[in-house]
Amino acid sequence: MKTIDLREKSVEELKALLDEQQLNQFRLRMAKATGQLGKSHEVQIARKTIARIKTLLTEKQGNGQ
């Protein structure tokens, strides 16, 4: 997900999306560990998306938005 799209979301929406992405990352890691994941780069994409969301949450909470 692009940062521009994430910036338009509220703090509550970002928190919900963060929970969803963390669950997705867990599932991807388990699939990779069991050898069922065909596209191993999806784990990296999920990790970077989580980092983007956390960064935006910190920015928004720091600015009081």
UniProtKB/Swiss-Prot annotation:
One Gene Ontology MF term: structural constituent of ribosome
Write down the InterPro entries for this protein, in alphabetical order: Ribosomal_protein_uL29 (IPR050063), Ribosomal_uL29 (IPR001854), Ribosomal_uL29_sf (IPR036049)
Q: Which UniProt keywords apply?
A: Ribonucleoprotein, Ribosomal protein
| Biological processes per GO annotation | translation
User: How is this protein annotated for GO cellular component?
Assistant: cytosolic large ribosomal subunit
Highest taxon of source? Bacteria
Q: Key word Ribonucleoprotein present in the record? A: yes
Q: Does the keyword Ribonucleoprotein apply?
A: yes
Q: Tell me one Pfam family matched here.
A: Ribosomal_L29
The record ties this protein, via NCBIfam families, to:
L29
Q: Which family does it belong to?
A: Belongs to the universal ribosomal protein uL29 family.
- Provide the protein name: Large ribosomal subunit protein uL29
Q: Which organism is it from?
A: Acinetobacter baylyi (strain ATCC 33305 / BD413 / ADP1)
